[in-house]
UniProtKB/Swiss-Prot annotation:
The chain crosses the membrane at residues 7-29. GO terms for biological process: mycophenolic acid biosynthetic process; terpenoid biosynthetic process. It is found in: Endoplasmic reticulum membrane. Cytochrome P450 monooxygenase; part of the gene cluster that mediates the biosynthesis of mycophenolic acid (MPA), the first isolated antibiotic natural product in the world obtained from a culture of Penicillium brevicompactum in 1893. MpaDE' is an endoplasmic reticulum-bound enzyme that catalyzes the conversion of 5-methylorsellinic acid (5MOA) into the phthalide compound 5,7-dihydroxy-4,6-dimethylphthalide (DHMP). InterPro entries: Cyt_P450, Cyt_P450_CS, Cyt_P450_E_grp-IV, Cyt_P450_sf, Cytochrome_P450_monoxygenase, Metallo-B-lactamas, RibonucZ/Hydroxyglut_hydro. This is Cytochrome P450 monooxygenase mpaDE'.
Length: 853
């Protein structure tokens, strides 16, 4: 009997406690209007979210009750963007609510992991955000622009191959915008794409995993206490996958691979964000938690791509259904192309950053359809706050939904629900700032989204590329749907795509050249003699491995292989050795690669070329002081063993560690032990502290002979240790020959440029762009594509100088047009070789196209 009484007493106590709690909760916010059920329970919020239309319910509630509405027993929603600075201040004190606790990924072994965007602890947030904030500044993000260019190139190629010329077969353009956003962030974070674009599908189920994560946390965020029971519970996770497990698995795999490569002294790309994350933690082990790189990387994968894709889909959909705005944007882009040389294939940030209508379209897309579309919840601090003339006591959860703030009619006008980019034009600075500050898409105050600049960069580069190269038409726009599960997802953006013709050249207008940067080559009275040796070896190249886009008739290019004899008085060096005569004795993996990808015709050892020379020159293989490899690929290394042991081998940074031991000691090596056997190998360093280190144009350089006559240049990217060379061949006036190695394989990658626009009489008038290079470097082969693109840009600066003659190792247009070994090329400028050969590649392309026709 006593036991029964105790049970009743306990039950009554629990009921009284719950009643007291409900009454207290109801009473403290009793003056705030809202639906009755919402004042008593959070189940009203749960149901709204479960429908996928919570934003519409929120809108209707505010239309009924005003700018401040009670959405739950302790949750208040505000719709007035004028109070954004109050709820989301720059100072600490307004922590995020428990809604964000549900967004921490969970594993049984490590528990819930905080990240920059989901942590509620403001001190921890500062610890996580401060070390990496500078990485997301626009200054740093722009340095990563070549990585976005790499992904743009792949997207364009996939669109061309899969959808252009398919008789207007519709495809899901929304999916492909998402693939681009994810592969761009993958490249920025890991230096490699996830593979969405190449495969045309959701790789590793990442996209579905993120969507599943969002649908879970959207509901749990309304009743966060239940998340601890149902999702973040080590017992429950024995029977179901933890929240965010799939994304964490991808993150952990990338991090473990990178850490392993570092431990094995393998070269990793130190420029991507993962390497920077690891470096930051390693340099501050006492103040930064060991798990921080994992948290930072998780944020990039989870929040850094889907949200960008969301804005891309919004902007594309509205442009396609409102063709007038599409025409206006395309007109602005065409004007930028015509007036400022904006590239069609890879629009530069400098070329697009300040285009007014493009900027207006991006802002309107950010405003109209924010990627996250539930209230951004904050906890009112001690002392309470007053918003919309209503007092909110401490502990109240308050938030503004970006969907409501961004469509506020008092701020954005009566047409705030409509797409109208022109609302952003012709505003005073004060009005423009007011509107921008009223958009809550990226958050506000001290918790503003770190990835904002990355998203803007990607969007402003993507749309010019698409609209200048393609005509896109939406199919069945009524099928375009949206679902709000915290993440405001769109579905059904189907379209057809056609390639736009290249712009016609105006033969009456000569493009004005921009002034290239100064090269600042150190003065010297010393020169060298340069002789181009045509080894006689021909290689059949697949263009898609070396440049994009593909052109009709250029399915195969037969290219020569050049090397160079450099003479400084009685000192002679060779820059490259072409292909060795007995190339089938190379390592088996290289022989197999050669047989599958190319055809070698008439290979010849350079030592034999020198020793069989019947001219009066008299320089033999025994006279060669050093062999300099531009890099260690088979078509440049030749056979050093045919030179005496006294001949030194000079290589670029990192070659020794990555290429030796050679074959057969290392079965996987691409070089032979005999390449270095019995001879000294000297590895060049471009460190500023090294003797002879200098700067030429944008290149780090090393004065080889020490007299200013011959420089080796750090031309990184194509392969480990890739270098170029610059030789001074005359003085008073100075003139130079640049030897580019494999920095690129076709002059169309270098020309035209804004420094060197195409002259009117250069050849085929149907070829594109007088100030935009015909081709872009392909990402297929370079070991460091970012560095390779940067090297090409650096060479363009040299190429624009009338005193520099650029010679690429495989430039077929030079054959029969310039002097070859045993003659010198020192008088190239007097013979006007630069003017006569610079644009021959246009005729080369024209002939290929005509041959295809």
């Amino acid at each position: 009997m006593e036991s029964l009484s105790l049970t009743w007493i306990t039950a009554i106590a629990v009921v009284l406690y719950l009643v007291q709690r409900y009454v207290r909760s109801y009473w403290r916010l009793k003056d705030i209007p809202g639906p009755v059920l919402a004042k008593l329970t959070d189940l009203q919020r749960v149901w709204w979210v479960k429908t996928g239309r919570a934003h519409e319910f929120h809108r209707d509630m505010h239309a009924m009750y005003g700018p401040i509405v009670r959405f739950g027993p302790n949750m208040v929603s505000v719709s007035d963007p004028r109070v954004i600075p109050t709820i989301y201040p720059s100072r600490p004190g307004f922590p995020k609510g428990d809604f964000y606790r549900t967004q921490k990924p969970y594993t049984r072994n490590k528990g819930a992991m905080p990240a920059v965007f989901n942590t509620q602890d403001e001190d921890l947030h500062k610890q996580l955000r401060s070390p990496i904030a500078s990485l997301y500044s626009m200054t740093n993000v722009v340095r990563l622009e070549p990585l976005v260019d790499e992904t743009l190139t792949v997207l364009s190629k996939q669109l061309d191959e899969r959808f252009v010329g398919t008789n207007d077969k519709p495809f899901d353009l929304g999916d492909w915008l998402q693939y681009f956003a994810f592969d761009s962030m993958g490249t920025l974070t890991f230096s490699r794409r996830y593979g969405f674009l190449e495969q045309g599908r959701d790789m590793h189920g990442i996209l579905q995993e993120i969507w599943n994560f969002m649908t879970r946390v959207a509901v749990m965020g309304q009743i966060p206490w239940f998340d601890e029971i149902w999702n973040k519970n080590s017992f429950i996770t024995l029977f179901k996958r933890p929240t965010g497990f799939g994304v964490l698995k991808v993150v952990d795999n990338f991090i473990s691979q990178r850490v392993s490569s570092r431990e094995n002294d393998e070269k990793a790309d130190e420029k991507d964000m993962l390497s920077q994350f690891l470096n930051i933690q390693a340099s501050n082990p006492h103040s930064i938690m060991p798990w921080a790189p994992r948290a930072w990387t998780f944020s990039n994968v989870m929040a850094g791509s889907d949200s960008t894709a969301n804005v891309m889909r919004t902007m594309m959909y509205n442009l396609l259904v409102d063709r007038d705005t599409l025409k206006s944007l395309r007109a602005e882009l065409l004007e930028a192309e015509s007036s400022n040389g904006l590239s069609r294939s890879l629009p530069s940030w400098d070329g697009v950053r300040s285009l007014p209508y493009l900027d207006a379209c991006v802002l309107e897309a950010l405003r109209l359809h924010p990627p996250f579309c539930l209230p951004f919840e904050r906890v009112v601090p001690e002392g309470g706050i007053t918003v919309c003339e209503t007092y909110l006591p401490a502990g109240t959860v308050v938030g503004i939904s970006p969907y409501l703030a961004n469509r506020d009619k008092q701020t954005f006008g009566d047409d705030a629900d409509k797409w109208r980019p022109s609302r952003w034009l012709d505003l005073s600075r004060e009005d423009r700032v007011k509107l921008e500050n009223s958009i809550l898409t990226f958050g506000a105050g001290r918790r503003t989204c770190l990835g904002k600049n990355i998203a803007i960069l990607e969007i402003k580069k993507l749309f010019p590329m698409l609209l200048l190269n393609y005509e896109i038409e939406i199919v069945n726009p009524e099928n375009y749907q949206t679902t709000n599960a915290w993440f405001f997802r769109q579905w059904g953006l189907h379209a057809v795509i056609r390639k736009l013709p290249a712009p016609e050249r105006d033969d009456t207008i000569e493009q004005k050249a921009s002034i290239p940067p100064a090269l600042n080559i150190p003065p010297s009275s010393s020169t060298v003699d340069v002789r181009i040796i045509d080894s006689g070896t021909l290689l059949d190249l697949r263009p898609d491995l070396f440049w994009t886009p593909d052109l009709p008739g250029l399915l195969k290019v037969t290219a020569p292989t050049y090397c160079f004899l450099i003479s400084n008085g009685s000192r002679h060096v060779l820059f490259d050795l072409a292909v060795r005569q007995d190339w089938e004795n190379l390592p088996p993996s290289i022989v197999a690669m050669i047989k599958s990808q190319t055809v070698i015709q008439e290979p010849r050892n350079i030592s034999d070329v020198l020793d069989s020379d019947e001219s009066s020159l008299g320089i033999r293989s025994k006279d060669i002081e050093a062999i300099i490899w531009s890099h260690a690929h088979f078509d440049h290394i030749g056979d050093p063993s045919t030179f005496p042991p006294s001949t030194e081998l000079v290589v670029g940074p990192g070659i020794r560690d990555t290429h030796w031991p050679g074959f057969p000691t290392n079965p996987d090596a691409i070089n032979l032990n005999t390449d270095i056997q019995g001879r000294n190998v000297r590895e060049i360093s471009f460190e500023k502290t090294q003797k002879g280190a200098t700067k030429i144009g944008s290149f780090d350089a090393m004065d080889y002979f020490g007299d200013g006559s011959f420089y080796l240049l750090d031309a990184a990217g194509h392969s480990v240790g890739h270098i170029g060379a610059l030789a001074r061949v005359t003085t008073s006036p100075d003139s130079f020959v640049f030897m580019g190695g494999d920095s690129c394989h076709h002059a169309g990658v270098l020309r035209p440029t804004k420094y060197l626009p195409c002259p009117l009489d250069s050849g085929d008038t149907s070829l594109p762009c007088k100030s935009d290079s015909v081709f872009t470097l392909s990402p297929a082969l370079p070991t460091d594509y970012t560095a390779a693109l940067r090297t090409v840009e650096n060479i363009k600066e040299l190429d624009a100088c009338e005193d520099v003659f650029v010679v690429l190792a495989h430039d077929a247009t030079l054959k029969g047009k310039v002097d070859f070994y045993p003659s010198k090329i020192n008088d190239w400028k007097a013979k006007e070789y630069g003017k006569k050969t610079k644009w021959l590649f246009y005729k080369d392309i024209e002939n290929a196209i005509e041959g295809q026709k």
